[in-house]
Design a protein with these regions (language model features):
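Transition-metal
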Residues: 1-132, 193-212
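Flexible, active-site-adjacent loop/turn segments at secondary-structure boundaries
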Residues: 22, 81, 135, 144-151, ...
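Conserved metal-binding segment of the jelly-roll/cupin
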Residues: 91, 154-173, 182
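Short, well-ordered, mixed-charge alpha-helical segments that flank or form enzyme active sites
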Residues: 99-100, 121-126, 132-137, 163-164, ...
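A short hydrophobic beta-strand segment most commonly corresponding to one strand
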Residues: 111-113, 170-194
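Active-site glycine-rich loop that binds ribose-phosphate moieties when present
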Residues: 132-162
Length: 212
C-alpha cells in the first residue's frame, strides 16, 4: 500500500486566524486561514495528491487503497479538518442522515472535536441547558438571548467532544481543533453574533428549515 501525501483545501472564513500556518505548518496564502480540509473527498474542498489528482479521483481509480470493507460505503465516509477559531463561529446545527438525504441530497453530519490548543478561559457551546419549545427558540433568536439557554462548556488542550447530528453547537474564540466528521458540508446557521474584519453581512441563517 502506498503512502499518500495530501495537500489540503483551505478556507478563509471571517472568524479564522493564522495559527494553522504559524503553529501547524499548513501552507496557504489565505488570510485569515480558518480551516484546512486535510483528508477530504468532498467536492467543496477536496484534498490533492502531489500530481494534482484529487483524493476522490484516486480512490475511485484505486478502490483497494481503502481495504476490503470499503464497498459497504457509497462514498468516502469521513472528512478531517483543522480549525482555527480566532473569533466565535455561528451557533449552528447539522442534520441527520435521514433529513439531509431527503432535503439536501447528501449525508448529514455527526462530528468529533479534539482540542489541539486553546486560550485561557476558552469555551464552546454544546446543546441546550433545558428542553425548549419551538416558540421559545424563535423568541430567543429574535431578542438575542439564545446563548442564555446554551451549555457554555470550558475547554482545555486535549479535550474531546462528540457532537451528534441535531445538536446545537458553536466553536468559540481562541480554540484550535482537529475535527473528524461525516463526509458532508450541510450546516444550518442558527445565530450569528458578529462579522469580523471585513465589510460584509452575516451569512443568512437557515434555522427555519430545521423546524419545518
Amino acid at each position: 500500500m502506498n503512502i499518500l501525501k495530501l495537500t489540503p483545501s483551505c478556507k478563509d472564513y471571517l472568524w479564522g486566524g493564522s495559527r494553522l500556518r504559524s503553529d501547524f505548518g499548513i501552507k496557504s496564502d489565505l488570510n485569515p486561514l480558518a480551516e484546512a480540509w486535510v483528508l477530504s473527498c468532498h467536492p467543496d474542498g477536496p484534498s490533492y495528491l502531489a500530481d494534482g489528482t484529487t483524493l476522490a479521483d484516486y480512490v475511485t481509480a484505486h478502490p483497494g487503497c481503502l481495504g476490503t470493507d470499503c464497498e459497504k460505503f457509497e462514498q468516502f465516509p469521513i472528512l478531517t479538518k483543522f480549525i482555527d477559531a480566532k473569533n466565535n463561529l455561528s451557533i449552528q446545527v447539522h442534520p441527520s442522515n435521514e433529513y439531509a438525504l431527503k432535503n439536501e441530497h447528501q449525508y448529514g453530519k455527526t462530528e468529533m472535536w479534539y482540542v489541539l490548543d486553546c486560550e485561557p478561559g476558552a469555551f464552546l457551546y454544546y446543546g441546550f441547558d433545558h428542553e425548549i419549545s419551538k416558540a421559545e427558540f424563535e423568541e430567543r433568536i429574535k431578542n438575542n438571548t439564545l446563548t442564555e439557554v446554551l451549555n457554555a462548556v470550558p475547554v482545555h488542550k486535549g479535550d474531546c467532544f462528540f457532537i451528534p447530528a441535531g445538536t446545537l453547537h458553536a466553536i468559540c474564540k481562541g480554540i484550535v481543533i482537529a475535527e473528524v466528521q461525516q463526509n458532508s458540508n450541510v450546516t444550518y446557521r442558527v445565530y450569528d453574533t458578529a462579522v469580523w474584519g471585513r465589510t460584509a453581512s452575516p451569512a443568512p441563517c437557515t434555522w427555519r428549515r430545521r423546524w419545518t
